[in-house]
Amino acid sequence: MDNFLALTLSGTTPRVTQGKSAGFRWRWLGHGLLELTPDAPVDRALILSAGIHGNETAPVEMLDKLLSALFSGSLTLTWRVLVVLGNPQALAAGIRYCHSDMNRMFGGRWQSFAESDETRRARELELSLETFFSSGHARVRWHLDLHTAIRGSHHLRFGVLPQRDRPWETDFLAWLGAAGLEALVFHQAPGGTFTHFSSEHFGALSCALELGKALPFRQNDLTQFNVTSQALSALLSGVETSTSFSPPLRYRVVSQITRHSDKFALYMDAQTLNFTAFAKGTLLAEEGDKRVTVTHDVEYVLFPNPSVACGLRAGLMLERLP
């Protein structure tokens, strides 16, 4: 299985759907779904996903290189792994999504959207995770969901962690730092993301890794993510990662800006970078007689997008943690 990405993009089912490789067994579970199981018993399970948004190609190319290393035998596998390419049709078309944003649909929220390829895919991915986690007895469960941002950022690489009732494990946060993440953003409320679903329903330690900016296939400079690729390789092979890194800055979400109608106006231009700071009292957005302003001494914007569909998030405002 050395052509997983090509088969997924072409919508082709391989003639052989399972087999053995260097130290592990593999199974094709469907387009964009590949299960890897080490020959030796392991108590660790990992979801490694990318392409939930079809225009975010750098992480997909990174996963393709990791799979090539595993199947060539140059990289050892020490986790049960489910590799997920989230939205194959959007990836093939080079667009963010075909109908609706899948990363708002998980946890059954797909039922509130008009039926589409994305709603069906969200349901399929939910069932795939349920099957994957229920078929093993993993003591450790991780989910790394790889993305790129629409906009540039003051932090080239950062992580977004879902709301979680239990404390985050220090080794997981340390690995995120070793993977080159410059900042970690902690959600304070539930959401429809893939990472929130895996965390809430299966107790996985989950993070969306935002790596650079969205570009078409073959236009990505993957060298800027070498530290992340090396950390992923070390993780898969069970090798300790370096501890000589600066701890990521930490932020928490303090509010969400939502577009409700065509009267919505977001007062940030197209050049506003993620993590741009705004002082207390700054007018951020207006919609009719509703005004959104900064309420803390300093807040930082994340994912500003004035053209989202009505009812969706047009941005998050963050507060820096000590």
UniProtKB/Swiss-Prot annotation:
EC category name: hydrolase
Gene Ontology terms: biological process: arginine catabolic process to glutamate; arginine catabolic process to succinate
A UniProt-annotated Pfam family: AstE_AspA_cat
Cofactor note: Binds 1 zinc ion per subunit.
Coiled-coil intervals: none
Reactions mediated catalytically: N-succinyl-L-glutamate + H2O = L-glutamate + succinate
Record: active site: 210
Family matches, as PANTHER family: ASPARTOACYLASE, SUCCINYLGLUTAMATE DESUCCINYLASE
Function: Transforms N(2)-succinylglutamate into succinate and glutamate.
Name under which the protein is recorded: Succinylglutamate desuccinylase
